[in-house]
Curated annotation (Swiss-Prot):
Its EC number is 4.2.1.19. The keyword Cytoplasm applies. PANTHER family: IMIDAZOLEGLYCEROL-PHOSPHATE DEHYDRATASE, IMIDAZOLEGLYCEROL-PHOSPHATE DEHYDRATASE HIS7. Disulfide bonds: none annotated. Keywords: Amino-acid biosynthesis, Cytoplasm, Histidine biosynthesis, Lyase. It comes from the Bacteria. This is Imidazoleglycerol-phosphate dehydratase. Pfam families: IGPD (PF00475). It is found in: Cytoplasm.
Length: 198
């Protein structure tokens, strides 16, 4: 069964469409109008083994906040739809990913009990023109809408770009592990209560 979903979101602030294939080959076609976010989402696709298409436009004459958050919301909704009832998946995943001097760790549980634990500090307020406080907004929106318990931690690092990118790459690798089908489960939900869809 194909694990593919398309979700759209239109508000007075943004218009977004996301197509996500969890069993892809790492191809990304992303245009959010926010260059650094595009770069990070390309990492999700590449290192998560997903195919990702995103087309977004927003009120960037104000700032990038609405676009970044709403892309996280819509991508999370597409993830939730694509993963389905979560039967037979590994469920848990974690990854440590370095980028030069920076090292980050992400741990996920596809429990359908969304939450974000965020322990990431950036030494600068911006990466280029991108506000570093918006990284948490994207992760929070994606976790909430995707039904993911997510722990994101920067263990150390000096360069804000490297810290952010190592977090996104670690998320990609953790999701790749958690989404993998575990043949030993025989299609059963990996939970003692028998379901992860409620």
């Amino acid at each position: 069964m194909a694990r593919i979903a398309t979700e759209s979101r239109t508000t007075g602030e943004t218009k977004i469409q996301v197509t996500l294939n969890l069993d892809g080959s790492g191809k990304a076609q992303v245009d959010t109008g926010v260059g650094f976010l595009d770069h990070m989402l390309d990492q999700i696709a590449r290192h998560g083994g997903m195919d990702l298409e995103i087309e977004a436009c927003g009120d960037q004459h104000i700032d990038d906040h609405h676009t970044v958050e709403d892309v996280g919301i819509t991508m999370g909704q597409a993830f939730r739809q694509a993963i389905g009832d979560r039967r037979g998946i590994t469920r848990f995943g974690h990854a440590y990913v370095p980028l030069d001097e920076a090292l980050s760790r992400v741990v996920v549980d596809l429990s359908n009990r969304p939450s974000l634990s965020w322990r990431v500090k950036f030494p600068t307020q911006k990466v280029g023109n991108f506000d570093t406080e918006l990284f948490k907004e994207w992760f929070a929106a994606f976790a909430q809408q995707g039904g993911i318990t997510m722990h994101v931690e920067s263990l150390y690092g000096e360069n804000s770009h490297h810290i952010a990118e190592s977090c996104f790459k670690a998320l990609a690798r953790a999701l790749r592990s958690a989404c993998a089908v575990d043949a030993t489960l025989g299609g059963v939900a990996p939970s003692t209560k028998g379901t992860l869809s409620d």
